[in-house]
Amino acid sequence: MKKTNLLLISALFAASTLQAQTTDLTKGLSIWFDKPCSLSGMASFYNYSADRDWEERSLPIGNASFGGNIFGSIAAERITLNEKTLWRGGPNTSGGAEYYWNVNKESAHLLPEIRQAFVDNDLKKAAKLTRENFNGLAGYEDYSEQPFRFGSYTTLGEAYIETGLSEIGMSDYKRVLSIDSALAVVSFQKDDVKYERTYFASYPDSAMVWKFTADKPGMQNLTFSYKGNPEAEGKMVAAGDKGLLYVGKLKNNGMEFALRIQAQHKGGSVKATADGKLVAKGADEVIFLLTADTDYKINFNPDFKDPKAYVGVDPVASTDAMMKAASARSYDELKARHQEDYLSLFNRVKISLNPNAPMTLEYPSIYDLPTYKRLASYRKGKPDYKLEEIYYQYGRYLLIASSRPGNMPANLQGLWANGVDGPWRVDYHNNINIQMNYWPACPTNLAECNWPLIDFIRTLVKPGEKVAQSYFGARGWTASISGNIFGFASPLSSQDMSWNFNPMAGPWLATHVWEYYDYTRDKQFLKEVGYPLIKSSAIFSVDFLWKRPDGSYTAAPSTSPEHGPVDEGATFVHAVIREILLNAIDAAKALGVDAKERKQWQEVLDNLVPYKTGRYGQLMEWSRDIDDPKDEHRHVNHLFGLHPGHTLSPITTPELAKAARIVLEHRGDGATGWSMGWKLNQWARLHDGNHAYKLFGNLLKNGTLDNLWDTHPPFQIDGNFGGTAGVTELLLQSHMGFIQLLPALPDAWEEGSIEGLLARGNFEVDLRWANGQLQEAVITSNAGQPCQVRYGDQTLNFKTKKGQTYTITSVDGKLVKK
């Protein structure tokens, strides 16, 4: 479970008060269904596409380490299980540590020849040399090499609880995920009995809790069983009279893991059987407690000769300790501690969109409609502002459930996966996907959820130094397109450079380290953790560049990730380098260090090849004007400087902003879920709220499954986070050095409010608007920084004191501080 010894995290945020929940959870912020899932996809471990119920209709719970998906079937509850660090691959496969780390090619000596080929306009030669020499040695699929060293995130298995009931005669069925109470609840009537099941995953108690009850005594006749990962060896055995223990080892790398289950009951009996089951008979209620762990330990300084560099936990002992602690508490105490912890984060932000708008659906109350039917109505063009609020807050729920201090970050599917392998290994994709996962973290006041990402970045530094030296003769560290939990930072074996060559993955990740500081102003963090990561990434970026005879700097070879040719100076690469060098300069200034390096970084910035516009007026994606206005590719890499960067803006670079707009017009308003999420943010940065809102609508209509998970297709969680971040950008921006109030408010949201957003400089901001105009902004200074506020063309500057709150209104075209 919690595997990291973290440095002190600044106590930036006050816990919210636990609020009582309504009995009918569908009345709050919830995702719910009126039909149970089928059991047809049970144990489809080798074919995720066959299990549509898991992808489209299951409901996820998690404590960032241990997760599950609730299906709510009647005859047998099915719950898929995941532990965040259960991975195949790494240095402990049969190939050993030397085999695992022997993944880089020594290619730096070829850079002069490639660059000369660009000078000679021999683009084929430059591409060929890059293709053949700047890939790596590790395969990306388990059939491509044995043993499979990159590995994949893999399932912990599935739990089943047979009930002895059937759907015949069932009524009043509801399966609810309450995102404002972090509970999943299944309820239904059967033979004049109301059955209810409640599920949650507790971060403070490192346990998953399931409660089965009914409104009449003696109705719980349950059989718990477990189906393990087929690529593991293990056995379920009794652990006491009412408990089970499964200890397994993955065949690929010998990773050991453990799952414990303990039953508590009122009335009747519960007994563990010799064949690894728990059987309850005639109980009034049964509570299942589950704990899970692996032998994985995070390692920031791995020994490249040690096959067990990432082994350091005894999961049998750790799950036992977790279970003893959890079982010592009552169900009510476990639930209260879980909700208090969750709500201390979730309740920081509240949003209300058009609260007085009349209902437009043909139901007495919008809450009478299950979520998938509301989504179907929304797809037909019927407004549903409450659904938009739910989607926004669901992104925050998913981040809390999949990323908390003490573990690895949210992956391509957050925490939840249902197979031995999954799409793109369910890995850490470093060319936008993992970064997008964390776009909403700071702006929606979940800054501490960044810590798993920061720790992940720290695992890449030592391996990334080898990558930088081998391929570019560079100092510092970098990463490549795909990462795992074992420090993998190298390119993969594919010679398709359009996706496999992205040395800017490291610098892009490092910009998130600066973002965390910029929002929190935690100088201890910056000094001890942040700046060393940023500085080393900046050093790599400078060494990576080619200083041409005319004194300008460019990136050769380079690519625009997943799109187009090997190039002399792809715009994306220059934009990322601008960002990390500016971050490094600001970080060094904040600490009062490295004046010499600051001067060098500024010299590179001053001479870096600038943004270019092409024959269509577009911001060029490559060094040559080869953009196709009919190309609607999902990646919009060359607008990195617009978002998530800050070197393109309608305020500071209006002509380049116009060129960026042309790019977005050419790319269109469709594509994959995550791509629509990115373009939503980019349109918001252009201050075009109506077009951004169109992208938000398209994301919900065309990129969202019935359980509100984002779909590529298939399911990828990044689009959920991109959507939440994009809505925030519509209402508040702070990337240009000042706080912009309602910078891209769409006409559709005529009235509304949002509370608790975080702006850079560590300002908490509440906003209220009516008739499309700002009514009031309430700004709390958490760090005592000077504050500059902008609303439209109005600006206001004032000094602040730490802990003080300031109210801003607009009077006669001027911002006024009360």
Language model features with spans:
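Short, surface-exposed recognition loops and adjoining beta-strand edges that mediate ligand/DNA contacts
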Residues: P409-D427, R548-E562, Q740-I754
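Acidic/histidine-rich catalytic neighborhood
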Residues: S536-A587
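Non-catalytic carbohydrate-binding regions of carbohydrate-active enzymes
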Residues: W514-R521, F525, V529, S537-K547, ...
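Aromatic-residue-lined binding/catalytic grooves and analogous aromatic/hydrophobic interfacial grooves
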Residues: Q21-M497, E515, K535-S541, R548, ...
